[in-house]
Amino acid sequence: MRPSNRTPAQTRPITITRSFTAHAEGSVLVEFGDTKVLCTASFTEGVPRFLKGQGQGWVTAEYGMLPRSTHSRMDREAARGKQSGRTQEIQRLIGRALRAAVDMKLLGENTIVIDCDVIQADGGTRTAAITGACVALVDALNWARGKGIIKANPLKFLIAAVSVGIYKGEAISDLEYIEDSAAETDMNVVMTETGKIIEIQGTAEGEPFSHEELLELLVLAKNSIREIVDVQKAALS
């Protein structure tokens, strides 16, 4: 039995609130149960130096956690003077995932920066961030089209992500912190709305897992992501 009494395949209640802040071209509050992440998308004309003159755009991401998003206060990374390896890994993951969803030629020489700030953490912050960031990205692209900055829609498909893992010998979806911290296997999966894989991050935290268990986890992730995409579509409708 899971601590929350959810079934193995059951995700937490998922809520996506658009236009959560006033200034960003796209802004979303995404909630996976008690995990809450603010995702903003900022659209700027121009691209980084390495892309200038190539007629294509760029999408990148930054990720951070508020000091009291966790059970005990942690120092701001700005106060420490450097980002942790975990932060760098997560923001690269978010950026890679979002770039997979965008036709950079149709974006033109424009840049979208996605900022994902964890307000409250209870496991699955990176997967929640990707899910919310995708909706913020859609809103930023629609803003740019409305302004006539870009003509065609560069979005190829929606993407979403979920954590899956093996907890007390059972494959489960959307792990909260108490499960994540005790899981034998922990995996983050990013997929397109049609179920194609963008990224898999999987680690045997306690016991090595079998090929059969890997396939079981991927099926679990695919089914959960299908449900999460439905939430995205409902928010965007």
Curated annotation (Swiss-Prot):
GO terms for biological process: rRNA catabolic process; rRNA processing; tRNA processing. Its EC number is 2.7.7.56. The keyword Transferase applies. The gene is rph. It comes from Shewanella frigidimarina (strain NCIMB 400). It catalyses: tRNA(n+1) + phosphate = tRNA(n) + a ribonucleoside 5'-diphosphate. Phosphorolytic 3'-5' exoribonuclease that plays an important role in tRNA 3'-end maturation. Removes nucleotide residues following the 3'-CCA terminus of tRNAs; can also add nucleotides to the ends of RNA molecules by using nucleoside diphosphates as substrates, but this may not be physiologically important. Probably plays a role in initiation of 16S rRNA degradation (leading to ribosome degradation) during starvation. This is Ribonuclease PH. Belongs to the RNase PH family.
